[in-house]
Amino acid sequence: QCNAFNVWRTQLLNSWRKSNYEALVQDFRLPSETEREYSARGGLDNNPYPWGGPYIRNSRGCFLGNFKPLRGRYMEDGGFHTVKTSSYHPNDFGLYCMSGNVAEWTNTAFDETVYDFAFDLAPDYVYHAKIDDSAALHRKVTRGGSWKDIGYYLNNSTRTFEYQYTAKSYIGFRNVMTHLGRVGKELDLENGEEIQSDIQLK
């Protein structure tokens, strides 16, 4: 379903852009596990949570994400299931709910030993399982933790998995697109003027 939505969203946007004589965009897709973790950290490399600190409550005792703080106590954080994404503050990249609310699918295949053989400069591990492959090959990495998870799963570096052919009330997805640079008219932030890039749109 995630990939079908990405195809639909790409076609819809490109159809609109084409009708307005604008350059077509790259395909929407699921992020890799590495991209997802980088985004969740928000530029704060050594902090365990997207909000920056080592705690899951702020100084006033309020929870910083939607998760299960105690056994069976789903309402302790103010949300029984999912909540509006704007219910909690974004991270330093301006992204909401990078931990808690719903865990998120990635495009990365799950393998417990992936860090033993993954290449540092291209750490994504992708396997497109066939229907008759074993269940282990149908596992995809999920990140971020959800409303039903304990605080451990909200950690930026915690990884778990779910089977790619299943749908769960506690797993969602986030679209990403590869950024290739500027195209067309851009705003010169330094001078506040509109500039034209080297690529001319026909």
What are these regions (language model features)?
Residues 1-156, 184-186, 190-198:
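Functional-site microenvironments in short loops/helix caps that host divalent-cation chemistry
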Residues 169-185:
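Short, structured beta-strand segments at or near domain termini in extracellular proteins/domains
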Residues 201-202:
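Short, solvent-exposed mixed-charge patches
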